[in-house]
Design a protein with these regions (language model features):
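A short beta-strand-turn-helix
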Residues: 1-17
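Thiol/disulfide oxidoreductase modules built on the thioredoxin-like
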Residues: 64-69, 76-123
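Short pre-active-site segment immediately N-terminal to redox-active cysteine/selenocysteine motifs
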Residues: 15-17, 22-25, 89
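Structural microenvironment flanking redox-active thiols in thiol-disulfide oxidoreductases
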Residues: 30-67, 77-83
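Nucleotide phosphate-binding site architecture
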Residues: 27, 37, 103
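C-type cytochrome heme c attachment motif
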Residues: 24-31, 92
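Hydrophobic beta-strand anchors of alpha/beta hydrolase catalytic cores
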Residues: 18-19, 47, 93
Length: 125
């Protein structure tokens, strides 16, 4: 989002990754954002955002006001990457293993119950 760098396997850390698809115009994304901020404090987890069909200036302003939980933000202006992932709408959250294989997918906003009951057991494996 901030640079035009191409993402490669070398950009992924050797740890589990939360991949979150979001947009500044998405009200449900705002509802889940504080939970993503909390998850980003866990140093055993990497967090990557996919900014979906959004204007860069709007997305950067949104993160500036609310905090940026992502180590990397991928701009998906027309939704091609998200379509390849099978995204139905935003927000959607994935957990990738250390080899970038999808282990978990959640459609809709995450909350504390989803984190505790569904995500943390996978993240702690």
């Amino acid at each position: 989002l901030y640079t035009k760098e191409t993402l490669t396997n070398s950009n992924f850390l050797e740890k589990k990754t939360i991949l979150n698809v979001w947009a500044s115009w998405c009200l449900e994304c705002e509802r889940e954002h504080s939970y993503l901020i909390q998850l980003s404090k866990n140093k055993d987890i990497d967090m990557i955002g996919i900014n979906y069909k959004d204007e860069s200036s709007e997305a950067m302003g949104w993160l500036s006001m609310r905090g940026n939980p992502y180590r990397i933000i991928i701009k998906d202006s027309i939704g091609d990457l998200s379509l390849d992932l099978g995204v139905y709408g935003v927000p959607e959250t994935y957990i990738l293993d250390k080899n970038q294989v999808i282990q978990y997918k959640h459609i809709g906003p995450i909350n504390n119950q989803i984190i505790q009951e569904e995500m943390l057991p996978i993240l702690s494996e």
